[in-house]
UniProtKB/Swiss-Prot annotation:
Induction section of the entry: Up-regulated in response to infection with influenza A virus.
Signal peptide: 1-24
Name of the protein described by the UniProt record: Neuromedin-B
Gene Ontology molecular functions: hormone activity; neuromedin B receptor binding; neuropeptide hormone activity
Residues excised as propeptide: 60-121
Family of this protein: Belongs to the bombesin/neuromedin-B/ranatensin family.
InterPro entries (UniProt xref): Bombesin
Subcellular location: Secreted; Cell projection, Neuron projection
GO biological process: one example: positive regulation of testosterone secretion
GO cellular component annotations of the record: extracellular region; extracellular space; neuron projection
Top-rank lineage group of the source organism: Eukaryota
Entry function: Stimulates smooth muscle contraction. Induces sighing by acting directly on the pre-Botzinger complex, a cluster of several thousand neurons in the ventrolateral medulla responsible for inspiration during respiratory activity. Contributes to the induction of sneezing following exposure to chemical irritants or allergens which causes release of NMB by nasal sensory neurons and activation of NMBR-expressing neurons in the sneeze-evoking region of the brainstem. These in turn activate neurons of the caudal ventral respiratory group, giving rise to the sneezing response.
Lineage per the UniProt record: Eukaryota, Metazoa, Chordata, Craniata, Vertebrata
Protein species of origin: Homo sapiens
Amino acid sequence: MARRAGGARMFGSLLLFALLAAGVAPLSWDLPEPRSRASKIRVHSRGNLWATGHFMGKKSLEPSSPSPLGTAPHTSLRDQRLQLSHDLLGILLLKKALGVSLSRPAPQIQYRRLLVQILQK
């Protein structure tokens, strides 16, 4: 009887080896993952879009930084005048370097005449 049990065991292991070698029996079990509430959400490619842009631009809750141009909102009137006079001096020096006359005004372009000519065509 011991011989039959040993033969059956050997036959069973040989059969299992043959099945594994043939690729019929999988080497690892693919168990289904546990379902959570998040897996029940359905995604529609063109479905409900009511909240699409709701969070656009809201990346953090930190207070906003000062203005991007570097000018603080509490600039005094004296500082503004100094900045404007500095900018005006730079513009005048640039015009002089380019050879633009400072005494006569810039020529006025007759947009009305040009517009009438275009509309008449």
